[in-house]
């Protein structure tokens, strides 16, 4: 049995096939895969071409450097970009001398400038938010102050209007009683329409005196009638537009009662 098991091994030895050949094949594949990763920032596509790419986490930049025929060309492109972004002390694949006039250098400068511009815009937007709120508060206070000014202006105008009306002409009726008494002595009654009910002011007073009424209620009634007549006189005088027109209407009813020049001088 042992001879039979050894015969396949002998045949394999004669054929030159060893069991460890598979392991050697796998080792060879591992060597090839290691060769693809020996450069930093370089990877190979399925088509066989080489790609270079660089990332910078501090500045949040990821830049595509291009596709190359060989891994060395892709690695040198990565080294140049790394030196421009991170400085000469960064890790590189080769000893690299950076050219500031290369197309890659101009691309990286433009990328950095755009990144700085975007950052400034973001900072400006954040800073403008509090200023907008302050502007809104100031506008609100301005509107409030304007409303206060309007209210004060309206109150001032109302005060001035009140003063203006206080300065307006108001006829003095203190001597009206004497005029009516003098008119009653001459037995002339002045008819002022429905306001006086065809009775003069002095006749109402004489009726209360001559009747000798001792009842308190009757006295109160006569006093009420007297006040009513006085109010009617005041209302009629204020309703007439102009003292001159008022005097003309009175003069037409009884020219002998009124003396126009003395009354005008009294009111003036």
From Swiss-Prot:
Expressed in roots, root hairs and leaves. Expressed in root epidermis and root hairs. One of its GO terms (biological process) is nodulation. Transcription factor involved in symbiotic nodule signaling in response to rhizobial Nod factors (NFs). Binds to the GCC-box (NF-responsive box) of ENOD11 promoter. Acts as a transcriptional activator of NF-responsive box-containing target gene promoters in root hairs. Functions as a transcriptional regulator required for root infection by symbiotic rhizobia, infection thread (IT) formation and maintenance, and nodule development. Necessary for NF-induced gene expression and spontaneous nodulation activated by CCAMK. Functions downstream of CCAMK to activate nodulation gene expression. Residues 1-21 have a biased composition (Polar residues). Residues 131-146 have a biased composition (Low complexity). It comes from Medicago truncatula. It comes from the Eukaryota. Residues 38-95 bind DNA. SMART domains: AP2. PANTHER family: ETHYLENE-RESPONSIVE TRANSCRIPTION FACTOR ERN2, SHN SHINE , DNA BINDING / TRANSCRIPTION FACTOR. It is found in: Nucleus. Keywords: DNA-binding, Nodulation, Nucleus, Transcription, Transcription regulation. This is Ethylene-responsive transcription factor ERN1. GO terms for cellular component: nucleus. InterPro entries: AP2/ERF_dom, AP2/ERF_dom_sf, AP2/ERF_ERF_subfamily, DNA-bd_dom_sf. Residues 1-36, 114-154 are annotated as: Disordered. Gene3D superfamilies: AP2/ERF domain.
